[in-house]
Amino acid sequence: MATTKFPKFSQGLANDPTTRRIWFGIATAHDFENHDGMTEENLYQKIFASHFGQLAIIFLWTSGNLFHVAWQGNFEQWVQSPLNVRPIAHAIWDPHFGQPAVEAFTRGGASGPVNISTSGVYQWWYTIGMRTNQDLYIGSIFLSFAATAFLFAGWLHLQPKFQPGLSWFKNAESRLNHHLSGLFGVSSLAWTGHLIHVAIPEARGQHVRWDNFLTTLPHPQGLTPFFTGNWAAYAENPDTASHLFGTSEGSGTAILTFLGGFHPQTQSLWLSDMAHHHLAIAVLFIVAGHMYRTNFGIGHSMREILEAHKAPSGNLGNGHTGLFDTVNNSLHFQLGLALASVGTICSLVAQHMYSLPPYAFLAQDFTTQASLYTHHQYIAGFILCGAFAHGAIFFIRDYDPEANKGNVLARMLEHKEAIISHLSWVSLFLGFHTLGLYVHNDVMQAFGTPEKQILIEPVFAQWIQASHGKTAYGFDLLLSQSTSNAYAAGQSLWLPGWLEAINNNNNSLFLTIGPGDFLVHHAIALGLHTTTLILVKGALDARGSKLMPDKKDFGYSFPCDGPGRGGTCDISAWDAFYLAVFWMLNTIGWVTFYFHWKHLGIWQGNVSQFNESSTYLMGWLRDYLWLNSSQLINGYNPFGMNSLSVWSWMFLFGHLIYATGFMFLISWRGYWQELIETLVWAHERTPIADLIRWKDKPVALSIVQARVVGLAHFSAGYILTYAAFLIASTSAKFG
């Protein structure tokens, strides 16, 4: 009986006599399209079933957070005093801890060593109405059941009787309706319901749970105003500025408001504003989900909409003709669009979590603020790089030139030189000018003439801030001018709390900006445009270029076309992705440095340090990186250790992983192949060791594989190093 060797999905690889079988097997495990015997229908079914597994993992993970906080955390103590108790994520059980470590990590009122939570879950659960450990346990158990249900659903949809057919997967209108109405619309409506029935009453000291849920009116007039059209009643009598969150003191009765600004005590958005926001989104999306033609012969057809989109001027050729089938038949195109959207949204989450904090007391937990910002920006970067990667794979595997003749997609390819060269020009302009300004300022400081620095006020950005109501700059226009119509309307009609919030120095709305911000803004613009240049060029040149017209025949990732064809190395679409990730990490480094340093000054009440030191490179290196590393690297020293020691160690460990990346990035395949052959020679001639044999002949990783291993270590090390720096430097200052 012959045992089937890994990988089962590729007979060719399973029969490979070398260790390539293992590494290529792992590398192509998720490339379902290219597996043996894969049909289009089976491909869709496999991916569909895997979505249930994904949801199960997410629910299980969230369930674990709830469970560990309920079991080992201090949620009930934190609720009593959110600003003075440090939230505990979970206990640490480590038999290696000496007494100093046990004492250093015993905090937050715990009886033994614990980890402090910097994820914001305490603030989130508190805001949505949870108050006891029992609430957390119930949530945890519910999510465990939900995860189980999703796992079962995933299994079920792989059974022949319950596998949807290909036509079901390609029914674009039904899917649009379902996702718009069902997922976005109804879930937003359900969330509005939770906020109105549970969270808002809890914020006013009224405890609503399943036992009194149906007997407690969320508004004194019940549904009467809704049915009589007197909707304004729901906005009357909002919570006052003196409201104590979680109590009835200073509370009102409004459930759907348009107050704007922040709750003065919690520094977070008004719950009644958020309920109103989700209700509006629910209405919009439920309506949107009834717009597409399915069973009843009414509504829009996506195909008809796209076929009709031809610019009357003729300047866009065939417009959107042919795009319906191109998108609907390409999973890579769809994934590219989805990743581009989600990546952008993820970056917006990073921006809004600190500028418009939705959770009570989040704004006063500085380490959590910094962590959430950094976390969401890095994730956005990876997701957006993935969008272009799948865009490139679409061009190689799925694009049909005949079906897209003269449409906007074909026209993008036809004028790709103009697109790529413009991005190149912008990147060069930004790079030389920004670096030139920074370096000039360094030289002036170094030569003892700091007054000769070139310091440019960002007047256009300040003008935009002023038009939204920021008065600090003295630009009298629109909302920053008390005699303007916009200002008058803003007082009564919409968001009366906005102008107070935007001119309050205790939050992060429309921060005051100067020459340092102007420079770092352009440094970040350089990073964004260079990353985009590499990604866009990779996708637009994926099918071929003047240098290599037959590139698409070589697939998504290839190292070179042999020794006989010079210049074909490093030009696969995969290589563009690989290079772009380095630029992405570089850019997000600048973004997070900027956010963190500027906020450290605001939180410490010392904004002048950023303003004075951020205009030259040595200022960034000395007053941000070096100065904020000092406490971190003293987590352990000759005199002992403290609670930052774990971050000190992780800082070193991150550097180690990062440096390991270069080992794979700098020394290439031939070096490893020679080394491996030497090691095999030695192994076979060493007593005892020579008893151990293997079937696969050891060979080095391919060039592309070595690059991906190098990239993975570079990325992981880079992020772990900064995570340790960020958490240690922030928590050391603010506890």
Curated annotation (Swiss-Prot):
Cofactor comment text: P700 is a chlorophyll a/chlorophyll a' dimer, A0 is one or more chlorophyll a, A1 is one or both phylloquinones and FX is a shared 4Fe-4S iron-sulfur center.
Keyword presence, Thylakoid: yes
A Pfam family matched in the record: PsaA_PsaB
GO molecular function, one term: magnesium ion binding
Positions contributing to phylloquinone binding: W672
Residues engaged in binding chlorophyll a B3: M663, Y671
Annotated localization: Plastid, Chloroplast thylakoid membrane
Bilayer topology annotation: Multi-pass membrane protein
Record: residues binding [4Fe-4S] cluster: C560, C569
Bilayer-crossing regions: 47-70, 136-159, 176-200, 274-292, 331-354, 370-396, 418-440, 518-536, 576-597, 644-666, 708-728
One cellular-component annotation, GO: chloroplast thylakoid membrane
Reactions this protein catalyses: reduced [plastocyanin] + hnu + oxidized [2Fe-2S]-[ferredoxin] = oxidized [plastocyanin] + reduced [2Fe-2S]-[ferredoxin]
Chief subcellular location: plastid
EC assignment: 1.97.1.12
UniProt subunit comment: The PsaA/B heterodimer binds the P700 chlorophyll special pair and subsequent electron acceptors. PSI consists of a core antenna complex that captures photons, and an electron transfer chain that converts photonic excitation into a charge separation. The eukaryotic PSI reaction center is composed of at least 11 subunits.
Biological function: PsaA and PsaB bind P700, the primary electron donor of photosystem I (PSI), as well as the electron acceptors A0, A1 and FX. PSI is a plastocyanin/cytochrome c6-ferredoxin oxidoreductase, converting photonic excitation into a charge separation, which transfers an electron from the donor P700 chlorophyll pair to the spectroscopically characterized acceptors A0, A1, FX, FA and FB in turn. Oxidized P700 is reduced on the lumenal side of the thylakoid membrane by plastocyanin or cytochrome c6.
Entry protein name: Photosystem I P700 chlorophyll a apoprotein A2
Gene expressing this chain: psaB
